[in-house]
Amino acid sequence: PVFSDRRVREAITLAFDFEWMNKALFYNAWSRTNSYFQNTEYAARNYPDAAELVLLAPMKKDLPSEVFTQIYQPPVSKGDGYDRDNLLKADKLLNEAGWVLKGQQRVNATTGQPLSFELLLPASSNSQWVLPFQHSLQRLGINMDIRKVDNSQITNRMRSRDYDMMPRVWRAMPWPSSDLQISWSSEYINSTYNAPGVQSPVIDSLINQIIAEIGRAH
């Protein structure tokens, strides 16, 4: 799958100029989310504390080092529609992941396969916001096809996992709950839930511990 490498996912995120889009299209009405429990006491705001480090210790070898050394923030651009610094970072990550430029196209250094994917949108949606994203990806040599389909096709393709990328809304609870399992557990990989297709023993273990703790609290 095109998004199986974390460096590719990070590079594509760097190409998404939220600051420009928010200013030019939405009158700065939106704010960026950097935690699943945004604006609650459970939001991730700092480095893991002592209790969290105890939970994470058995899984440390399976986690990116950044979990312990960096406070997560989404990429921030200059908001001018062309953030050269972010695109250079994205280019570096793609090269490290084995995706190189050949002419104007990003291809796999080993197989020659082009780096391309499809963005699936509901037929009724406004695609204005994704066109600048598509243009930024083109600067990196990545082709993103935008395809609109009706709601029944969206549902069918979700059930069969026949999609590369689509917009999703997570209506998260303001506190940890069993909803975490539905949204992120590998147990729900063959359903319309867990839309990103996350399959991680680490995430499964953490979710199970959270649910067990909720049970003890009640």
Describe the function of each predicted region.
Residues 1-36, 40-216:
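Extracytoplasmic/periplasmic ligand-capture domains
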